[in-house]
């Protein structure tokens, strides 16, 4: 019995030695039909502002595709102004409007229409503490708490101007 088990095991192991290499097939080769120009890839780092980075990258690429020139708009300009606007709306509705880092493509369009656009050189990300990239960890923690405290407060009067 032991002999037959040993012979069966050796027989199975020998199958591995006579296996032949299969020829490797080449993968699918893509052919570029149309290549649109794009702007450089930006790093949002630790800021929940992907909505602004992707939205402005789309707009910059579309301007480039249409032959309108190469632009690098400031994401932080749109983010800064929309956060102020969101904070004002959250306070006026006593917290019934979402105040968070997230957003959508329409927030970029709204920011362009309402506040305009500026070049990246005018308002770079990470201008605090010598950083070169955005880090909104502290900003989010503080601004969420401040807006929530004001929104749930018992103030009877709110200034008509959000920037007063």
Language model: regions and residue ranges:
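Bacterial Sec-dependent N-terminal signal peptides
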Residues: 1-21
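N-terminal regions that are enriched for targeting/export leaders
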Residues: 21-33
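Active-site-adjacent structural elements in enzyme catalytic domains
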Residues: 42-85, 90-120, 126-127, 131-133
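Surface-exposed loop and adjacent secondary-structure segments within mature catalytic domains
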Residues: 119-151
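C-terminal edge-of-domain segments
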Residues: 154
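Conserved small/polar residues in nucleotide/adenosyl-binding loops
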Residues: 157-164
């Amino acid at each position: 019995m032991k002999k037959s088990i040993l012979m069966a095991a050796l027989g199975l192991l020998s199958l591995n030695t006579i296996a032949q290499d299969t020829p490797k097939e080449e993968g699918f080769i893509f052919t570029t039909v149309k290549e649109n120009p794009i702007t450089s890839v930006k790093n949002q780092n630790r800021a929940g502002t992907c909505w602004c980075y992707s939205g402005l990258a789309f707009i910059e690429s579309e301007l480039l595709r249409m032959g309108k020139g190469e632009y690098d708009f400031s994401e932080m300009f749109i983010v800064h102004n929309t956060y102020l606007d969101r904070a004002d709306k959250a306070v006026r509705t006593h917290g019934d409007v979402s105040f968070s880092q997230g957003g959508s493509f329409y927030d970029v369009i709204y920011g362009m229409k309402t506040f305009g656009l500026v070049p990246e050189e005018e308002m770079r990300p990470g201008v605090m503490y010598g950083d070169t990239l955005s880090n909104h960890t502290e900003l989010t923690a503080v601004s969420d708490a401040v807006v929530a405290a004001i929104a749930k407060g018992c103030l009877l009067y709110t200034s008509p101007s959000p920037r007063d």
